[in-house]
Amino acid sequence: AEDLCMAVSQSGETADTLAALREARKSGARVMALTNVVGSSMARETEGNVLFTWAGPEIAVASTKAYITQVEMMLLIAVDLGRKRGVLSPQRAQQMLTDLAALPEQAKRVLELAGEAQRFASRHFDRKHVFYIGRGLDWALAMEASLKLKEVSYIFSEAYAAGELKHGTIALIEEGSLVCALLTQRTLAEKTLSNIREVKSRGAHVLVICPEDLCEQARTVADEMWLIPNVPCLLYTSPSPRDPKTS
């Protein structure tokens, strides 16, 4: 079989993911699982083709460490596949691994924003809806952030690809709407800034979350701004505060 199907599930028991895995196997694809639970259905049904995240029990309703370890594991898989296929140089691969190992220290700096986040929540806790926007990798982050807000605060929230705002989404933005804009993709920064200007023109209150090297550009459009450390763009999807040497 030339196709590989990777099933990702914290519990290893997610019914629809299991069904998709079984269907892929029936179709002749090789299957593997990425899960947090040893002895789960996915671990058994992939017959040893399984990678465990070893995140420990997930207690919170909103997935935190399980999600983070899944993203990190998939990044490591991508780096290794890139090296083996010859599309990623050994030097570039090593640099990505070095950057990933340094990420816990960078994440600790982000945790210092806790007080600022609490004050932000105190100002906006009575919002009826919150929108998240971003481009590229930032859209994936926006979807996860929106999910976390819904699960924890029960505030209606949706995430949208910033480039698709004009296709109906912009009509939902009204005076006083809270929009959280993620701006970490440097090559897409100008386009995202243009989208932020669009929502501001409709009266939105905008929080921009961006790295330090984009703060001057973001300052021109943001009502509020949180600065995060400068790291390679791909690593913004993997916000681990853990030390990979000890966990």
State where each predicted segment sits:
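Extended hydrophobic-aromatic, low-complexity segments
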Residues: 14-18, 119-120, 140-144, 151-152, ...
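Conserved small/polar residues in nucleotide/adenosyl-binding loops
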Residues: 236-241
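Glycine-rich phosphate-binding loops that contact phosphosugars or nucleotide phosphates
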Residues: 1-95, 99-102, 182-231
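Active-site phosphate/pyrophosphate-binding segments
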Residues: 48-178
